[in-house]
Regions:
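C-terminal tail/sorting-segment detector
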Residues: 704, 723-746
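Autoinhibitory N-terminal propeptides
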Residues: 18-148, 156, 258
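Subtilisin-like serine protease catalytic core
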Residues: 20-21, 144-274, 291-295, 322-326, ...
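C-terminal subdomain of the subtilisin-like protease fold in secreted/lumenal serine endopeptidases
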Residues: 56-60, 293-302, 306-309, 320-331, ...
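Short acidic, glycine-rich surface-loop motifs adjacent to enzyme active sites
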Residues: 253, 280-307, 330-331, 450-453, ...
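Residue-level detector of functionally pivotal "anchor" positions at catalytic/ligand-binding pockets or at interdomain
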Residues: 649-677, 685, 744-746
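Hydrolase catalytic cores
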Residues: 250-258, 284-294, 324, 361-368, ...
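Active-site core segment of subtilase-fold serine proteases
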Residues: 164-225, 242-244, 290, 381-464, ...
């Protein structure tokens, strides 16, 4: 621990020396910290009397330097520039490149006048809801009412995630005879001989995929098996069918912080946001090679920042998305965590207590005008320790950085505050604040923080630690559960999905009833992250069911972790080709993202050239507004719950026909039979006559029949002119009223 703090302080102090070797303003903060760490490592290793310069020169050896995957914005002919600096160009979109570069040569690259920015950031987290662990249960997803005529056929759906079981029968068709995964890139695969990729290996075709069996992390992770099932699973011998169940599938297993054990330390910096962007490109390229439109679901994320760590990432995503290329991502699961405080101009102070079980806490202050941070440590005595740091003092310091230490409760507290311009609004300054100790921070006493100063409009974000209330100062209860949307969901070109709730309990495979109440009837799951984004845009964009979704779980995870706590949320175990598989209930915006992506796959089947802007227009016109007391869009629900059927009617241009319902009927299922017939199956025999009216997609009436069912089903014979996709409108008793898109079977 002492060594960690020493290195932290040295890293900060060494930035001035580093500035002589690199153009700091061109580097995102994480890239700066990487190079500073390498420089410090060389300094620490220089214990045999060699000069510091010689030690650094040794560290600059390209052959021995770790490689970083990063975004580079550069002008002109970059081939010779990259070659001279030992860089491998992996992807280019306009003036933005994804490059594998030796860390030792970042400084040299940054000094070149062609280069305006080098950006990278460490990997993401899988976004499973953790509140179920605290409340003791999860529950099942009931499913959406989906149009029979649109199933995702002819559309490529993609998932980038961790923990894939490629052998799960959910990824075959319903009969388990036709395998639907077309291609898989495992970025963590150790089988890199003759690989076409910078990291890992790709696998194509049924035989190769089933032989590989699972992603490298598949014995210990199963997140991707679940999310892919929600999007595209056939439901094999169960009611747990995904949304786009006849789509083709392409998947990428990336690396998250959950996968550190599978990454060699020499390769740690290869797995970044830029590597994720390569994964998205791989899926879109696979779809293009097969002539299919594509939607990708991404159920991972990391916090936003004001530093600009993801500016080039967002620009790259803008380039990758477009007609027939849609990217959907989960909002995050921080909706129950107070992490934001706003002190308006004219107010003297706003604040909260901070709690952490770790040895550090981190805050970010975004300020317009001069403010100060007041930190108080409360003790059992009447004397408290108070620290006040003015933002003006930080700005006046060398390199806009203050480092200090003090004694609190007999222990040393280290403080670091660095200032920089807000990357979204240069009129505002941002201050990164870190508190560190040799032991637990709460050993110094109860800790409160306040933004003070009437002349400033200021925001405080808690990055490490938790903002909590405490009776020691009841006035400090200003923390809000907002401003916590994850990246890349915060990107303008990404469809950001929050989670809402339906079922409140389920029975697991042991027969135990498990209850986890996050609301019903589409109410927002309280864990679902809330906007706005750090630059003030409304997010999430839309909601989808995410609380207690039932989907596929990995047989390899079940085999290797039979006593894991999440196995108690399995609703069924079953055998297939000699292995035991599971259906599992889980919660989080991780579950909502693939469901929304599945709906968009149905829309792409109807209109393969949809752009992200088209999708947002459909969402804005057709989403179900769950809470009618709110105005839409808003930072809780976006435009509301995604509506697969209403969206299809809108795309097909028949939503304006007043006699066609915008919802499917509740108590009757309509299915095509051979010979141009339709079967209507009722939940119970109707007591009154019904009318079935059949419309073409041009809005013309093809047929209309009134009938009195004599049982719980009825068969209609349609005229020969009824072909292709038609709209069937049922009128009569309320529970049977609605419309459905049906593909006629001849």
């Amino acid at each position: 621990m002492k060594k960690a703090i020493l290195i932290f302080l040295l890293a900060v102090c060494q930035l001035s020396a580093f500035a002589q070797r690199a153009a700091l303003g061109k580097l995102s903060p994480w890239v700066r910290s990487i190079v500073a760490e390498q420089r410090l490592s060389a300094y620490v290793q220089n214990s045999n009397g060699k000069s510091f310069a010689k030690s650094t020169a040794d560290a600059n050896s390209i052959s021995s330097s770790p490689m970083l995957t990063a975004f580079v914005r550069a002008e002109g002919n970059v081939d010779s520039l990259f070659s001279a600096n030992g860089c491998q160009q992996l992807l280019s979109c306009g003036d933005i490149y994804i490059v594998a570069m030796p860390i030792s040569n970042i400084a040299s690259l940054s000094q070149n006048s062609q280069v305006s920015r080098i950006e990278s950031q460490r990997g993401t987290h899988a976004l499973m809801d953790i509140s179920g662990a605290y409340l003791g249960a999860t529950k099942a997803y009931q499913g959406l009412s989906l149009p029979q005529a649109y199933t995702g056929k002819g559309v490529m759906v993609g998932v980038m995630d961790i923990g894939f079981d490629l052998t799960h029968p959910n990824f075959y068709d319903r009969s388990a005879t036709n395998y639907r995964i077309r291609s898989f890139w495992d970025q963590l695969s150790a089988d890199t001989i003759n690989s076409a990729h910078y990291v890992g290996q790709s696998y194509h075709g049924t035989e190769a995929l089933l032989r590989y069996a699972h992603s490298r992390d598949g014995l210990d992770q199963t997140h991707g098996t679940h999310t892919l099932g929600s999007l595209a699973g056939s439901g094999f011998n169960s009611p747990y069918r995904g949304i786009a169940y006849e789509s083709d599938i392409c998947i990428v297993a990336n690396a998250t912080v959950d996968d550190v054990a599978f990454i060699d330390t020499a390769d740690y910096y290869k797995f970044t946001y830029a590597t994720d962007a390569l994964g998205f490109k791989y899926i879109f390229d696979t779809a293009d090679s097969l002539g299919m439109p594509c939607v990708v679901s991404f159920s991972e994320g990391a916090p936003q920042d004001f530093r600009g760590d993801d500016q080039l990432y967002f620009a790259m995503l803008d380039s990758l998305t477009g007609p027939g290329h849609i990217l959907v991502s989960s909002a995050g699961n921080n909706g129950l965590i107070p992490s934001y405080i706003h002190k308006p101009l004219g107010d003297e102070s706003r604040g909260s207590f901070v709690w952490t079980s770790a040895n550090r806490a981190s805050l970010t202050i975004n300020s317009l005008g001069v403010s100060a941070l007041r930190t108080v440590f409360y003790h059992d005595t009447d004397v408290n320790d108070t620290i006040i740091i003015k933002t003006s003092e930080v700005l006046a310091a060398e390199d806009s950085m203050l480092i200090d230490s003090t004694i609190i409760a007999g222990q040393k507290l280290y403080l670091s505050i660095s200032a920089y311009d807000n990357c979204y609004d240069a009129s505002r300054q941002v201050f990164d604040v870190q508190f560190l100790t040799l032991d637990r921070l709460d050993a110094l006493g109860k800790m409160s923080v306040e933004i003070i100063g009437k002349d400033a409009d200021a925001e405080l974000y808690c990055d490490e630690g938790y903002l909590v209330a405490n009776d020691l100062n009841p006035a400090l209860q200003d923390a809000e559960c907002t401003h916590n949307i994850n990246s890349p969901s915060a990107a303008p070109s990404v469809i950001c999905v929050g989670a809402n709730s339906y079922r409140q309990s389920f029975e697991n495979y042991l027969g135990d009833l498990r209850t986890y109440d996050m609301g019903t009837n589409g109410q927002r799951g309280e864990y679902s992250s809330v906007g706005p984004t750090f630059d003030g845009r409304i997010k999430p964009d839309v909601m989808a069911p995410g609380t207690n979704v039932i989907s596929s779980y990995s047989s390899y995870y079940l085999e290797n972790h039979p006593q894991a706590s999440d196995i108690l949320s399995d609703v069924a175990h079953f055998d297939f080709q000699g292995r035991t598989y599971a259906w599992n209930a889980n919660s989080g915006t991780s579950m909502a993202s693939p469901i929304a992506a599945g709906v968009i796959a149905l829309w792409l089947q109807a209109c393969p050239t949809l752009t992200p802007q088209d999708v947002m227009r459909i969402i804005s016109h057709t989403s179900r507004r769950v809470d009618p007391t709110l105005s839409y869009p808003n930072n809780l629900y976006g435009y509301g719950e995604i509506n697969a059927y209403a969206g299809l009617l809108y795309i097909l241009g028949i939503d304006g026909i007043t006699d066609i319902s915008h919802s499917t009927p509740h108590d009757v299922a309509i299915s095509p039979l051979s010979g141009g017939r339709l079967k209507l199956a009722f939940a119970s025999q109707p007591s009154q006559s019904l009318t079935a009216t059949v419309y073409s997609l041009s809005g013309n009436i093809i047929d209309s029949q009134s009938f009195m069912p004599t049982g719980d089903s009825h068969v209609l014979q349609l005229p020969a002119s009824a072909s292709g996709v038609v709209v069937v409108q049922i009128s009569g008793e309320k529970q049977y009223q609605g419309s459905q898109l049906i593909r006629i079977s001849k």
